[in-house]
Amino acid sequence: MPRKKSAAKRAREQAKKEAAVPATDTATIKTSETSATTVKPAIEASKSYVPSEDEEEDEEEEEEEDDYGELITDEVENGINQVLDAIKNNKTDKLLDPKVKFFEDPESAAAKLANREGKHKPIYLKDYHRMNILSGDALKEDDEEYEHATVDGKQSFVSQQREEKTQLLNEIKSAFSDEENEESSGDEDDGFLKKKEPSTKKEGKNLPDPTVNEENFLEEFVNQQAWIPKKGDKVISLDLNNNEEDDEEFEDAAEKFENAYNFRYEDPNAAEIISYARSQATLRRSDDSSRRRKREEKRKIKEQIKAEKETALQKKKTKKLNKLTDILEQLTKEYGAEINADMVKKITDTLLKNDFKEEEWDNVVAELFNEEFYQQEGKPTWNEDDEIMGDFYADADGDDQTEEGEVEKEQKEEDEEEGPKRKKSKKEEKLQKKKEKRKVNELVENALEQNKLALIEEVEKEEEERKSRSRTKEEQDLKFRYREVSPESFGLTAREIFAADDTDLNEFIGLKKFAPYRSKELRAKDKRKVMKARRLREWRKKTFKNENGLAPVEAEAGEKDEDTILIPVEKASKSKHKRGHSHKHKGHQKK
């Protein structure tokens, strides 16, 4: 659809048409009634006139946009306000009266607009160049450029140095002049701290709140021409082609996105060469052969076996040491024997040759405390705190109780005086016990070191026994082994199990129910289900034609034998088959 023409444009077109038509008295046309009759046919003819497509296109091209409302003058605004007031107040008489005019004539409006456009005629680039040429400024600039120009059109080195020199001198002069001004003012801080002049901000347009009064807001918005941008206002450019920097940034961002999308399946580190350090094992060549590798493997195996033997020997030695130490402490406690190297040697020899048992304790003691032991000088002594000899001391004290009753008070007094001395004696006793224990350990270790071969033989013997108890090679190669299960007959007799066929037994209960990995709950549930009396009767009736199963049948007089098992006649034809498969179904009884 073609755009609507503005009032000024319509006025200009009307003026052109009137200039083409013979001149008439416009005043009489406006005032007289006959003029109205002559204007009506012209208006009807103009309505019936349809412009062609070319004319419409030319009009659209020639038409200029009124972005800032320059065509809306004060007179037009007043007319619009009068029309709105008349509509609001329902002044239909005023609106329908042809004599009342709210807007001025189009001719005068067009003339005013032409005068305004003439006053503010823009200066184009051509006009600017023309003005420079006429004034002669352009020729002066060309002469100056020609003086400093070179053959290739660039500025010469001499002229460049001259400009830099003059610029440097000007900067030095300006710096000295600033220092003189600072000294004359007498304020040292003026050069560094200067108060900024308050910026006079232009007050914005005060518009009423549109939510409170829309009509007042619209009226003020039109009166103040708030739609026209002022200097300093932020302008949002909707045309991206105007800003070259924005175009470059947008193109870069678009290119990055396109590359990222096109190469999204590629390896991001494909362009980098990753290097790996060479290991020392593969860096140099070695003369390894298959024989050498086998020798190394054998050597490692031997070292491993040797280390295991050393570990086992050390464990055995520690075990024997603790055992001998306990025995010696027990002998000292019970028999009051003094521990020496000969006694330790006898005990170690006895225990290493034969395994020590509590039943043979008397024999060991008899070997230790023989005639040689009693022929030694001195006699055994026991500690007063000993449990075994405590009764003996108690009896001795009982006999002399009457005699010692009088002396108790004196002993108590002596004990109170000798309290600190007893504490010292207890510490000395502890140290003495530690020394004796350390001495016993040293004696036992020396004895075990002398009998090291016996310990090694014992360790090797235990290793051989362990290997003999372990599974053989064939057993190790087996991936499956049968597992023993508890026997279960599920309410059937041995005679019924041997007499029934495989299909009948599988119908009664399948072999899957005997799986050892089944849980106890499932096995108990299957057992309750299978051993129901009704189910047993039905299965026996179907298999043996008898609800009670196979009854004991007596053998004939000439063929009585305790080992004979009689089978019913109906199943006689299948007896061979049953006997051949009887071994398979023994699992129903044994399991």
UniProtKB/Swiss-Prot annotation:
InterPro entries: Kri1, Kri1-like_C
Spans annotated as Disordered: 1-70, 142-213, 281-303, 375-442, 454-478, 548-591
Residue stretches of biased makeup (Acidic residues): 52-70, 177-190, 383-418
GO biological process, one term: endonucleolytic cleavage in ITS1 to separate SSU-rRNA from 5.8S rRNA and LSU-rRNA from tricistronic rRNA transcript (SSU-rRNA, 5.8S rRNA, LSU-rRNA)
Regions of compositional bias (Basic and acidic residues) in chain numbering: 10-19, 191-206, 464-478
Chief location: nucleus
Location of this chain's protein in the cell: Nucleus, Nucleolus
Pfam families according to UniProt: Kri1 (PF05178), Kri1_C (PF12936)
Segments of skewed composition (Basic residues): 574-591
GO cellular component: 90S preribosome; nucleolus
Residues that bear Phosphoserine: S177, S184, S185, S486
Post-translational modification: N-glycosylated.
Record's keyword terms, sorted: Glycoprotein, Nucleus, Phosphoprotein, Ribosome biogenesis, rRNA processing
Ranges of biased composition (kind: Polar residues): 25-38
Further remarks about this protein from its record: Present with 1780 molecules/cell in log phase SD medium.
Record's subunit section: Interacts with KRR1.
Function field: Required for 40S ribosome biogenesis. Involved in nucleolar processing of pre-18S ribosomal RNA.
Family membership: Belongs to the KRI1 family.
PANTHER family, sorted: PROTEIN KRI1 HOMOLOG, ZINC FINGER, ZZ TYPE
Designated name of the protein: Protein KRI1
Organism: Saccharomyces cerevisiae (strain ATCC 204508 / S288c) (Baker's yeast)
Gene: KRI1
